Amino acid sequence: MTSSVRNGSPSPSPALPSTTTPAEQESRNAMTMANNPGDWDSSESRPQSLSNGKGIGNGMVANGHQKPSTSSTAASANNASAKDPLRPRRKKAKRACFACQRAHLTCGDERPCQRCIKRGLQDTCHDGVRKKAKYLHDAPNEALIPGIRGNLYNQAQAARNKVNSNSQQRNGTNSNSDNNSTNTNSNNKPSHQDVSTNFFSTPSANNYHNVYTQAKSRQSQHMPSRVMQDATMNPSAFQAQPPASPTFDLSSNPQNHTLSPSIAQNSGTTPSSSASQNPDPYGSTFFDPSHPALFNFDIASMNFGNRYGALEFGMLGHLATGAGDTPPSDTATRRGSIGRSSGTFTVQNFGEGSSNQSPFLFGGDPVLNDWNPAGQGPTNPRNIYNQNSVSGQMTDHPHAFAIESAPMNFASPTSTESPQMTTVTQFDDPSVNFSSRTTLMPPTNTQHQQQPQPPRISTPSLKNMQVGVKRRYRSPSSIYESVKEPYSYTSGFHSLTAFIQRRFSPQKTLQIAKALASIRPSFIATTKTLNQDDLIFMEKCFQRTLWEYEDFIDACGTPTIVCRRTGEIAAVGKEFSILTGWKKEVLLGKEPNLNVNTGGSSSSGVSSRGSSTYNSRNSATTTVMDNQSLPAGRTQPVFLAELLDDDSVIEFYEDFAKLAFGDSRGSVMTTCKLLKYKTKEDGVGLFRNSNGEVSAGGGDTDANDSAGAGVGDGTTTAVNGVSNGSSNNATNVNANGNVNVIPNDLSGASSMKSSPKQAWGKSRIAGEAGMNQLGFRDGKVECSYCWTVKRDVFDIPMLIVMNFLPCI
């Protein structure tokens, strides 16, 4: 490009040829705007030909000749102001429009931006598309739509735009060489004031639900023709629902809200008219992301007792399943869950349904299991998105991103139904009639009255599953109302110390005392700052945790016990009672503990092979004496040390000292010997030691003598009124239901022959009767057990959970 100077004034450049390159066009625009400094706006960037110093500036024309002094002064002042370090910095836009992105120029947050308005491109100004990251490669385009925060109404920005538009119209900004063509174009396009009015109209409370609809309509209406050919920018890819559903409403008439203008036309209403019938449920808040209806969360239908837990569960499911929102696969059904396949929708949910239809995704049924009208015909489970229901508006795309469109796998069965696992074939066969076993849409009130509810499909849950007899619902609120005072752990430790001193020898007592003494400083450090309220809260935490464990213990078939940190039994499963013979009432201290089986120990510490007498706290007299020292209204549960033999007790407390304040997630897996529950009636005739003397504790007995009848000085022992020397065998049925046959023959061999119960072998264990025979000879059941310590909020050991499996 050349220019000449005649008579002190620059002559206009010759006309450019019709085929100009983009660089020449940009240079020409830059030269034109350099002659009109008033055209520059603070929100628009200079052309690159000026900013990089290679174009026109500092009074030089394109060919390097000097310009007149007046023009040189204006250009120099303008260029100096642009390099002023104190000039206000332009705010970086969150996302540039398509035109500014192609030109690599700074854009603004408003739409249309100032640069597109000055160039007459306001009708095609829209957000540019960024290159997808690798982790978003499989995400649909609608999930990548920028948030509505950038498109919200900004009153201050709109006022500035209006002032700028008025000043531009007064000053006449279109003074370039293409003035005529621009004026011709402007006749067919709205003015800047009209654009500002259309794009930044005040969003009243009546159109809060149409945010994404307006954004999508602007993108589809003002998209250039060249972009329409691009598959990645095709607005048809944005026809699916945005991440947040625009149909939420908590008003009394939610059916008037529409999904899009096309649906509104089908239903005979318009977005503005339908929205104006309902007030804004949020008041002054235009967009409340914490509201549950934003993500189609129906709090009432979720199986939660509180709002915050349901919201947290819903958001976790929303994050887990809402990113890709791909059609459901067979893996969802193999897990026993319908998954997103249950989220079938029709047009009735978006504006033209009856008043009985619920606007939420999950419907009005609080159990989350009824999803289809009961009278509906055969349904194809693969056609879950209703591709022809909304005439192309929702083709192959579900409604919003919901929490797996009904967490069927987390729904707990009620007390009137039995848990059943759904097979895969029920979902894979399109000809199967779903109405015979479940429903996919919330049925209307009329359908509820006409037809009974079909059985619901659900995955077995351990929380509220029906075990044995019908269970009544328990509320944890009773725990917080009933606990009024802290638990006296001091009395528990005193009782434990007294029991250990009575049962164990001094040497074994010292080993247990050393283990407990090692954790005593930690107990003191963690409890010295606790007051009365903290101790009450600690007991509430214990009872609340125990409330959860009781349900799992009842549903689990493993022998399990739960005890406090003092070793007092707090919960027990029926399998443990079957294995050991200890009744639940006895373990919890509700019935007297009459056990005499201590694994061979005695009060004096002498082995059971000696001729010592048994004097245990477990006798009826001793139990009454111990209970007299307990606080009023408190019973004394059985200690864990009473259930194990001597070596197992010592090993347990040594491991407990390491785990109590050590690894909070640690566990111990080892072997032990559980003591069977034996009273005097059971034990005297069942056990004798190797010397032929009666041993109530059972002691360490030989194989040949372990099952023989009790022998004192050569005479048989009478049981239940059976006289000595009787020729008939005496049969004793103890409190546990065990039948003990006491033969007249004193030999162990004849005893084995005459007692069918004692003839059980390990290969013939079957049912409860077989479990009762474990440890029948010596009163000990060899087990492998695993236990762990659970701490409370003060990091103090709260309870011990133990699982046992017998070694057979």
Curated annotation (Swiss-Prot):
One BP term from GO: gluconeogenesis
GO cellular component: nucleus
Ranges that cross the membrane: none
DNA-binding region: 97-125
Entry GO MF terms: DNA-binding transcription factor activity, RNA polymerase II-specific; RNA polymerase II transcription regulatory region sequence-specific DNA binding; zinc ion binding
Alphabetical UniProt keywords: Activator, DNA-binding, Gluconeogenesis, Metal-binding, Nucleus, Transcription, Transcription regulation, Zinc
Residue spans of biased composition, Low complexity class: 69-83, 171-188, 442-451, 598-619
Bias (Polar residues): 158-170, 189-203, 248-279, 339-359, 377-387, 620-629
CDD domains reported in the protein's UniProt record: GAL4
Keyword rRNA processing: no
Record carries keyword ATP-binding: no
Pfam family, one: PAS_13
Cellular compartments annotated: Nucleus
Region Disordered: start-end pairs: 1-90, 158-203, 236-285, 322-387, 442-461, 598-629
Listed InterPro entries: ERT1_acuK_gluconeogen_tf (IPR050335), PAS_13 (IPR056751), Zn2-C6_fun-type_DNA-bd_sf (IPR036864), Zn2Cys6_DnaBD (IPR001138)
Family from the record: Belongs to the ERT1/acuK family.
Function according to Swiss-Prot or TrEMBL: Transcription factor which regulates nonfermentable carbon utilization. Activator of gluconeogenetic genes.
Protein name as annotated: Transcription activator of gluconeogenesis PAAG_01030
UniProt organism field: Paracoccidioides lutzii (strain ATCC MYA-826 / Pb01) (Paracoccidioides brasiliensis)
